[in-house]
């Protein structure tokens, strides 16, 4: 039976440590980390994510604000809002909730955020720093996965890691973080031929393809470590990941559950990066 990698418990532990660090920062430097979340439109899934981020920020002791903007806002108006918070010393982290409406150029908006306040790690300057081995702000899901692997003492050096999914949010930055740990990395996607055969060679398999229960036991080798990034609904409407958990858990050594695996760590890393941005602000 596989060890269940409990991301929720790890997140709670890290959040408690963060509360202590924030309290010390307030006492010593009179600084409260500040996070502003900018939400355009009324996407129901985005609203849930934003509420979760708000709760986590308040729990950590941050100064937190959500800016709700009309879906009809122009690109220029949105950039003006971002620029306002770029200049506001009360806020150390700026998060623009994605996706944005179709009439807004996402890359232009990501470029508008001050890289020092880009706690999502999506600004090209931060992605460039990651690729050059000098990461500061890293996309939160891959950062959270690395914390889970560290917590469970998963050896990466010399190991074969396979990632299903090539997004800028998970797949690509995940590959770079694993390379930094001297893993041999294969980045795959839905059009990779003989995908199950490729995945079956992995010591560490990270799945972020967005298809419910896509990965079955034929994809995994005996004793592998499996990280499931997906969050979907199965035919019965129950939350599930991209991995068929019940099938795969009998074959692997460790696996993250859905829910309670990667998800809680994503928000925790967002809070941690906001705290780190506040620390860096002391240096100017």
Swiss-Prot record:
Q: How does it assemble?
A: Homodimer.
What are the UniProt keywords, alphabetically? Answer: Amino-acid biosynthesis, Histidine biosynthesis, Hydrolase, Methionine biosynthesis, Multifunctional enzyme, NADP, One-carbon metabolism, Oxidoreductase, Purine biosynthesis
UniProt name for this protein: Bifunctional protein FolD
Reaction(s) catalysed by this chain, per the record, are: (6R)-5,10-methylene-5,6,7,8-tetrahydrofolate + NADP(+) = (6R)-5,10-methenyltetrahydrofolate + NADPH; (6R)-5,10-methenyltetrahydrofolate + H2O = (6R)-10-formyltetrahydrofolate + H(+)
Top-level taxon = Bacteria
- Identify the stretch annotated as signal peptide in this record: none
Annotated metabolic or biological route of this protein: One-carbon metabolism; tetrahydrofolate interconversion
**CDD domains assigned to the protein according to its UniProt record, in alphabetical order:** NAD_bind_m-THF_DH_Cyclohyd
UniProt keyword annotation of Oxidoreductase present = yes
Q: What is its EC number?
A: 1.5.1.5, 3.5.4.9
Q: Where does NADP(+) bind?
A: 165-167, 190, 231
Protein function: Catalyzes the oxidation of 5,10-methylenetetrahydrofolate to 5,10-methenyltetrahydrofolate and then the hydrolysis of 5,10-methenyltetrahydrofolate to 10-formyltetrahydrofolate.
GO terms classed as biological process: L-histidine biosynthetic process; methionine biosynthetic process; purine nucleotide biosynthetic process; tetrahydrofolate interconversion
**Under the cellular component aspect of Gene Ontology, which terms does the record hold?**
cytosol
Q: From which organism does this entry originate?
A: Streptococcus thermophilus (strain ATCC BAA-491 / LMD-9)
Please report which protein family the annotation says this sequence is part of.
Belongs to the tetrahydrofolate dehydrogenase/cyclohydrolase family.
Q: Which GO terms describe its molecular function?
A: methenyltetrahydrofolate cyclohydrolase activity; methylenetetrahydrofolate dehydrogenase (NADP+) activity
């Amino acid at each position: 039976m596989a060890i269940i990698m409990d991301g929720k418990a790890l997140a709670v532990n890290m959040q408690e440590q963060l509360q202590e660090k924030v309290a010390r920062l307030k006492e010593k430097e009179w600084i409260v980390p500040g996070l502003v979340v900018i939400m355009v439109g009324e996407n129901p899934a985005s609203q849930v994510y934003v509420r979760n981020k708000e709760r986590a920020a308040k729990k950590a002791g941050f100064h937190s604000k959500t800016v709700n903007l009309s879906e009809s806002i122009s690109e220029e108006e949105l950039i003006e809002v971002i620029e306002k918070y770029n200049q506001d010393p009360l806020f150390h982290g700026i998060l623009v909730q994605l996706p944005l409406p179709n009439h807004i150029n996402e890359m232009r908006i990501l470029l508008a955020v001050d890289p020092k306040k880009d706690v999502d790690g999506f600004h090209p300057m931060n992605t460039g720093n990651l690729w050059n081995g000098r990461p500061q702000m890293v996309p939160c899901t891959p950062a959270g996965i690395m914390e889970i692997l560290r917590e469970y003492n998963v050896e990466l050096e010399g190991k074969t890691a396979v990632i299903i999914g090539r997004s800028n949010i998970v797949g690509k930055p995940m590959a770079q973080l694993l390379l930094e740990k001297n893993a041999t990395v294969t980045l795959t996607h839905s059009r990779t031929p003989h995908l199950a055969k490729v995945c079956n060679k992995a010591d560490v398999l990270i799945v972020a393809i967005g298809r419910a229960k896509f990965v079955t036991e034929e994809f995994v080798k005996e004793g592998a470590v499996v990280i499931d990034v997906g969050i979907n609904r199965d035919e019965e409407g129950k939350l599930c990941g991209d991995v068929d958990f019940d099938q795969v858990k009998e074959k692997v050594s460790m696996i993250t559950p859905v829910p309670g695996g990667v998800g809680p760590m994503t928000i925790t890393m967002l809070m941690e990066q906001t705290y780190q941005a506040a620390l860096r602000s002391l240096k100017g």
